[in-house]
From Swiss-Prot:
The gene is MSTN. It is found in: Secreted. Residues 1-18 form the signal peptide. This is Growth/differentiation factor 8. The keyword Zinc-finger does not apply. It comes from Antilocapra americana (Pronghorn). The record marks 98-99 as: Cleavage. Glycans are attached at residue 71. Coiled coil: none annotated. One of its GO terms (molecular function) is cytokine activity. Its main location: secreted. PROSITE patterns: TGF_BETA_1, TGF_BETA_2. Homodimer; disulfide-linked. Interacts with WFIKKN2, leading to inhibit its activity. Interacts with FSTL3. Residues 19-266 form a propeptide.
Length: 375
């Protein structure tokens, strides 16, 4: 009993020396600590966002197999961009992001872009294949995007100038060949007859899939084609070499190639906004603006929602590998902590100019963060 009294006396003496406890001070310190934590989280998210934007630039160039961004001016784009139905449909009905679940988790995506449509503009043929020293329209060069994919569709698009009176137009597509003994330089590909009424000019498409497939099998046979569209008076209405005011009316090839479907896989994760106080791993919104990059060579989309992952990954939040939580409990010093990373990503469709001034419509995988998790 005497010992207990001594202990109580010592305890009371310590309280007197220490003075009264300020509960408000402790509360203020806690509040300041929380504010500091939130500021640090905001700063971390801002750094993560900046890093994500820079990574997207690098990824796009890499996935499109471009060493640098194509140097194409806005004026050049206006001249090269065809004013044609298939391109307008791609832009008007543009599907920037697919919300379906057909594209699965990150590990199921291929790295490089999948080409779906290639729009190839004509180039001038070399002197050896020109007839009588004059370039004949049109010569098309094909990139590996066409050569190493299955061609599903190939259409030659030509623009016919307007007529003043109703007339019948005879369209003929000729393939340039090596000179034969009788001097023949052409062989027919397709011919058709169509009626035109007064008014605006029209775009006409012609199936050239068989010819394209032959060219891909035997590239040396690709010497070019000639286009004729004669009215009843023998006037050629086809725009092969555009005159002033005819920008965007060049002939071109629209080639569609096969795409490979991907497997799907569902995942779960948190969604947050920029004002969220969530400290755990979460998906945050991020819009990529290609015009802000100065990337005029991307026709569409001009911007898209990429999103990014940020937040803490304590082992209790671990989603992808639950067994790691048990490992950490057994050996907390010997196991590395999880990171907040994308666990599900989806592609974007993109319409762009490549380095050869060809218009490509394709799918770039793993460009949109759909889910974030700790792994």
């Amino acid at each position: 009993m005497q010992k207990l009294q001594i202990y109580v006396y010592i305890y009371l003496s310590m309280l007197i020396v220490a003075g009264p406890v300020d509960l408000n001070e402790n509360s203020e310190q806690k509040e300041n600590g929380e504010k500091e934590g939130l500021c640090n989280a905001c700063l971390w998210r801002q750094n993560t966002k900046s890093s994500r934007l820079e990574a997207i630039k690098i990824q796009i160039l890499s996935k499109l197999r471009l060493e640098t961004a194509p140097n194409i001016s806005k004026d050049a784009i206006r001249q090269l961009l065809p004013k044609a139905p298939p391109l307008r449909e791609l832009i008007d009905q543009y599907d920037v992001q697919r919300d379906d679940s057909s594209d699965g988790s990150l590990e199921d995506d291929d790295y490089h872009a999948t080409t779906e449509t290639v729009i190839t503009m004509p180039t001038e043929s070399d002197l050896l294949t020109q007839v009588e020293g004059k370039p004949k329209c049109c010569f098309f060069q094909f990139s590996s995007k066409i050569q190493y994919n299955k061609v599903v569709k190939a259409q030659l698009w030509i623009y016919l100038r307007p007529v003043k009176t109703p007339t019948t137009v005879f369209v003929q597509i000729l393939r340039l060949i090596k000179p034969m003994k009788d001097g023949t330089r052409y062989t027919g590909i397709r011919s058709l007859k169509l009626d035109m009424n007064p008014g605006a000019g029209i775009w006409q498409s012609i199936d050239v899939k068989t010819v394209l497939q032959n060219w891909l099998k035997q590239p040396e046979s690709n010497l070019g084609i000639e286009i004729k569209a004669l009215d009843e008076n023998g006037h050629d209405l086809a725009v092969t070499f555009p005159e002033p005011g005819e920008d965007g009316l060049n002939p071109f090839l629209e080639v569609k190639v096969a795409d490979t479907p991907k497997r799907s896989r569902r995942d779960f994760g948190l969604d947050c906004d920029e004002h969220s106080t969530e400290s755990r791993c979460c998906r945050y919104p991020l819009t990529v603006d290609f015009e802000a990059f100065g990337w005029d060579w991307i026709i569409a989309p001009k911007r898209y929602k990429a999103n990014y992952c940020s937040g803490e990954c304590e082992f209790v939040f671990l989603q992808k590998y639950p067994h790691t939580h048990l490992v950490h409990q057994a050996n907390p010093r010997g196991s590395a902590g999880p990171c907040c990373t994308p666990t599900k990503m989806s592609p974007i469709n993109m319409l762009y100019f490549n380095g050869k001034e060809q218009i490509i419509y394709g799918k770039i995988p793993a460009m949109v963060v759909d889910r974030c998790g700790c792994s």
